[in-house]
Amino acid sequence: MTENFILGRNNKLEHELKALADYINIPYSILQPYQSECFVRHYTKGQVIYFSPQESSNIYFLIEGNIIREHYNQNGDVYRYFNKEQVLFPISNLFHPKEVNELCTALTDCTVLGLPRELMAFLCKANDDIFLTLFALINDNEQQHMNYNMALTSKFAKDRIIKLICHLCQTVGYDQDEFYEIKQFLTIQLMSDMAGISRETAGHIIHELKDEKLVVKDHKNWLVSKHLFNDVCV
């Protein structure tokens, strides 16, 4: 039984490493020699995946689920990153290691592949293709951060909420032709926290969008019409 368990664990790890190899566009054979340094872990909704700088020695590949990364600067400001499966994180300090105060939490049940940050940095130095791919991903990460900040600059609360919903659809939404689907985790409280407005105001705006058939609550998921984004999407 022990041998079967180890075999199953190794097969799972190999499968996820192949997924990572596809994501960063390299042959699996480049990662295979380092399989023993990697791990696969499962997290339940609400569980902390890491809190840096104490746990910043790993890079993670999100295999399944949704996460929120809350980055705290020296002034106490909070920057939120939302991610769904098929993303590598955190990579902003990959080439310039520094302490980053970032809390990463599972918004839904999640599965992640972990590997040492030093290993990824070494692979980048040894392989130009990996470096170029990671550099492009870092730029995408910065663009996401910029879009989030642009949404927060909207003068009117309703515009701010709409742009934040648009931002979430683009980052963690699932394209379903006429609408986007956002899984489980989105709540009125989270929207009010993101927009910096009261829960009551956020709830009133969402209610208006529901009346206009632009947002529909389907069980715990949100269905967002693409008509919502006309002329306001950042």
From Swiss-Prot:
Residues of the DNA-binding region: 188-207
Q: Which GO terms describe its biological process?
A: regulation of DNA-templated transcription
Residues that bind a nucleoside 3',5'-cyclic phosphate, according to the entry?
Answer: 40-129
Keywords annotated in UniProt: Activator, cAMP, cAMP-binding, Cytoplasm, DNA-binding, Nucleotide-binding, Transcription, Transcription regulation
List the Gene Ontology MF annotations in alphabetical order.
cAMP binding; DNA binding; DNA-binding transcription factor activity
Where is it found, in Gene Ontology cellular component terms?
cytosol
Q: Which InterPro entries is this protein grouped with?
A: cNMP-bd_dom, cNMP-bd_dom_sf, HTH_CRP, RmlC-like_jellyroll, WH-like_DNA-bd_sf, WH_DNA-bd_sf
- What residues does the HTH crp-type domain cover? 155-228
Q: What is this protein called?
A: HTH-type transcriptional regulator ArcR
Which species expresses this protein natively?
Staphylococcus aureus (strain NCTC 8325 / PS 47)
